[in-house]
């Protein structure tokens, strides 16, 4: 994808989510499944990486659902997104919740170029399937991590089951999320994500499935990664 096409694609994604920002914190609105998934995402991160007093960056933070949860676990949280309305919603909600979170309107690539002090943990949830270059996002995430730091990614697998459940079912039949939220061709299989991550200097530690039940509006971690999944990577430590 050339730079002009990539920019256009990213702009379209930003506009798509900006238009939904006012619904972000409504657990019955357009982000209803995300609210159900969030406790399991937080549990996965907290079980695999100590959070208290550690510097954490949430990339593609949206309205701040994950960022706030991680801040409540004691992490010093910074969070970035390219959607202006989402950042404003996140800042307002954090203020109302009396949480200290540093929200910035930046991409991971922009933030990495500004050379901040490296983070202990970087989270990138439900984002990589929306960016024009997953490889570039992973490379930026590595630059933002200290050696030995943890990266957590959640996304949707590219399988027939994920197409039927996460796209046809969730977007068109049950209308849990807006139509057009996901493009099947842009989804990554775990092996593809692991290969890109390895090229960026990351080691795969774990892949776990994240199952959502739309009828009970509940989620659980599972060994089945055929639809939603979480992946834990670690930045390779520098040689002594």
What are these regions (language model features)?
Residues 1-25:
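N-terminal, positively charged/glycine-rich alpha-helical extensions of SAM-dependent methyltransferases
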Residues 35-52:
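Conserved alpha-helix/loop element of class I SAM-dependent methyltransferases that forms part
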Residues 54-60, 152-174:
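Conserved class I S-adenosyl-L-methionine
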Residues 65-110:
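Class I SAM-dependent methyltransferase SAM/SAH-binding core
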Residues 112-121:
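A short acidic, Gly/Pro-enriched loop at the edge of an enzyme's catalytic core
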Residues 135-147:
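A short glycine-rich, Lys/Arg-flanked "PGG" loop and its adjoining helix->strand segment in the class I
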Residues 175-192:
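Acceptor-substrate binding/catalytic loop of class I
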């Amino acid at each position: 994808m050339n730079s002009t096409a990539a920019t256009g694609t990213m702009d379209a994604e930003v506009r798509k989510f900006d238009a939904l920002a006012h619904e972000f914190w409504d657990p019955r609105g357009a982000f209803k499944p995300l609210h159900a998934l969030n406790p399991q995402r937080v549990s996965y991160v907290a079980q695999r990486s100590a959070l208290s007093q550690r510097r954490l960056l949430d990339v593609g933070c949206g309205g701040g659902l994950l960022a706030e949860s991680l801040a409540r676990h004691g992490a010093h949280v910074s969070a970035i997104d390219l959607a202006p309305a989402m950042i404003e919603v996140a800042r307002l909600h954090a203020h109302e919740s009396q949480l200290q979170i540093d929200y910035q309107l930046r991409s991971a690539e922009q933030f990495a170029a500004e050379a901040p002090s490296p983070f202990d943990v970087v989270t990138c949830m439900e984002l990589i399937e929306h960016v024009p270059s997953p490889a570039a996002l992973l490379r930026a995430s590595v630059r933002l991590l200290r050696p030995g730091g943890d990266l957590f990614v959640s996304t949707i697998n590219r399988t027939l089951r994920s197409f039927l459940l996460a796209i046809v079912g969730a977007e068109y039949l049950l209308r849990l999320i807006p139509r057009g939220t996901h493009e099947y061709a842009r989804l990554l299989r775990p092996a593809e994500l692991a290969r890109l991550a390895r090229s960026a200097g990351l080691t795969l530690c774990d892949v776990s499935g994240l199952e959502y039940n739309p009828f009970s509006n509940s989620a659980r971690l599972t060994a089945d990664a055929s639809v939603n999944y979480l992946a834990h990577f670690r930045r390779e430590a520098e040689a002594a």
